[in-house]
Amino acid sequence: APPPVGDQAGGRKVDCFKYNTKGSAFACTRHERPVCGTDHRTYSNECMFCMLTQNKGFGVRILQDNECDIECTQYSDMCTMEYLPLCGSDGKNYSNKCLFCNAVMGSRGALFLAKHGQCQSP
């Protein structure tokens, strides 16, 4: 599905000020409404997303309302050679999730999953 109007392909920006009611502290509820950040990490709700990404120093956005298709919370610098290709938003093919997640972390949240499988060749 195409992204909603007003959203960029790289996810939607969140107005985190609405959760930051106590100056520098966030007042988040335990309400489960998962969102997926462009860093490919699932956050339990939008407020937790704001709280946990505020100090990352780069513009992590919400990629989708729901859990991430590809979760990059647990990944290794050393990747196996398994071949389960993923197509990145940069048009490059990544041989597996580990290599894709390393590229996501290297891009500081700018890279996201375009689709499972290989990118279309020109």
UniProtKB/Swiss-Prot annotation:
- Domain of life of the organism encoding this protein: Eukaryota
Keyword field:
Disulfide bond, Protease inhibitor, Repeat, Secreted, Serine protease inhibitor
Note whether Secreted occurs among the keywords.
yes
- Which residues, if any, are the signal sequence? none
Identify the main location.
secreted
Site, as annotated: Reactive bond 1 for trypsin:
R30, H31
Pfam families under this entry?
Kazal_1
For this chain, the annotated S-S bridges are: C16-C50, C28-C47, C36-C68, C72-C101, C79-C98, C87-C119
Q: Name one GO molecular function term.
A: serine-type endopeptidase inhibitor activity
Q: Positions of the site: Reactive bond 2 for elastase?
A: M81, E82
One GO term describing the cellular component: extracellular region
Q: Which InterPro entries match?
A: Bifunctional_prot_inhibitor (IPR051597), Kazal_dom (IPR002350), Kazal_dom_sf (IPR036058), Prot_inh_Kazal-m (IPR001239)
Q: Where in the cell is it found?
A: Secreted
Kazal-like domain spans which residues?
Answer: 10-70, 71-121
Taking the record's annotation, the residue ranges forming a coiled coil are: none
The job of this chain, per UniProt, is described as: This inhibitor is composed of two homologous actively inhibiting halves: one which inhibits trypsin, the other which inhibits elastase.
Q: Which PANTHER family match?
A: OVOMUCOID-LIKE-RELATED, SERINE PEPTIDASE INHIBITOR, KAZAL TYPE 2, TANDEM DUPLICATE 1-RELATED
Quote the protein name from its UniProt record.
Double-headed protease inhibitor, submandibular gland
List the source organism.
Panthera uncia
